[in-house]
UniProtKB/Swiss-Prot annotation:
Family indicated by similarity: Belongs to the oligoribonuclease family.
Primary localization class, coarse: cytoplasm
Gene Ontology, cellular component aspect: cytoplasm
EC category: hydrolase
Compartments (UniProt record): Cytoplasm
Pfam families per UniProt: RNase_T
Gene: orn
Entry's EC annotation: 3.1.15.-
GO molecular function annotations of the record: 3'-5'-RNA exonuclease activity; nucleic acid binding
Annotated Gene3D superfamilies: Ribonuclease H-like superfamily/Ribonuclease H (3.30.420.10)
Keywords: Cytoplasm, Exonuclease, Hydrolase, Nuclease
Name of protein: Oligoribonuclease
Active site as annotated: Y141
C-alpha cells in the first residue's frame, strides 16, 4: 500500500520535533528471536493528536515455513484479515520496508526526537531491534505506551476504563488509529487537566 496524505479537510502536518510517530506491527508470534514481522504501518501526528498523516503500510514477505510455525490464534486471526495472503504475495523485505518508512518519517520529524508510540509498544520495539535495527535507532529511546494509561485506568478508574471498547482488528494501520483514539479518550476522561496559569504568572519549569 502507498502512503496516504492528510485529508483535505485538515491542515497539512508540518515538520516539528514534537511530532509523534505511531507504529504497529503484526508478527508471527511473540518471540523476536524465533518469530518474524509480517506487517508494519506508521502514522505521524502533531503533539496534540489533531493532525495525522498515514505512512506506507507493508506486508512483509515471509516463507511458507515461517508462516507454518504460527500458532492457531495467529493463523486464524491473520488468515481471517487476509494478511497471510498479502504476506505470501508480497516481495517486500524487512530491510526494504524499514528504509522506506524511515525516509517517510524524516519528512515530519528529525531522527532521535519522537518516542515510539503505540499500544504495548515495547513488544514492537523488541522485534524492530532484532529485525530492523537501523530503523529502531531512528526513534528516541523513550516510548509513549498507551497501555500504561490503560493499566492505570483499569485499577484507579474502572468505570472509565470500561468506557473505551477496542475493535481488535489486528491489522497494523487500524490498530494505530485505535491507539490514537484510545489516548484521546484517556486525555478527555482520565488525565487531570493542567492548572491554568494566572495572568502575569509563569508556568513552572519542567
Amino acid at each position: 500500500m502507498t502512503d496516504t496524505a492528510a485529508s483535505a479537510s485538515q491542515p497539512a502536518l508540518v515538520r516539528n520535533e514534537l511530532n509523534l510517530v505511531w507504529l504497529d506491527m503484526e508478527m508471527t508470534g511473540l518471540d523476536p528471536d524465533n518469530d518474524r514481522i509480517i506487517e508494519i504501518a506508521v502514522v505521524v501526528t502533531n503533539s496534540t493528536l489533531d493532525i495525522a498523516v498515514e505512512g506506507p503500510v507493508f506486508a512483509i514477505h515471509q516463507s511458507d515455513e515461517t508462516l507454518a510455525k504460527m500458532d492457531d490464534w495467529n493463523k486464524s486471526t491473520h488468515g481471517r484479515s487476509g494478511l497471510i495472503d498479502r504476506v505470501r504475495a508480497s516481495t517486500v523485505t524487512e530491510a526494504e520496508a524499514a528504509a522506506q518508512l524511515q525516509a517517510f518519517l524524516a519528512q515530519y520529524v528529525s531522527p532521535g526526537k519522537s518516542p515510539m508510540c503505540g499500544n504495548s509498544i515495547c513488544q514492537d520495539r523488541r522485534f524492530m531491534a532484532r529485525w530492523m535495527p537501523e530503523f529502531e535507532r531512528f526513534f528516541h529511546y523513550r516510548n509513549l505506551d498507551v497501555s500504561t494509561l490503560k493499566e492505570l485506568c483499569r485499577r484507579w478508574q474502572p468505570a472509565i476504563y470500561k468506557g473505551f471498547q477496542k475493535r481488535a482488528m489486528h491489522t497494523a494501520l487500524a490498530d494505530i488509529h485505535e491507539s490514537i483514539d484510545e489516548l484521546k479518550y484517556y486525555r478527555e476522561h482520565f488525565l487531570i487537566p493542567a492548572a491554568s496559569v494566572s495572568a502575569g504568572e509563569s508556568a513552572p519549569a519542567a
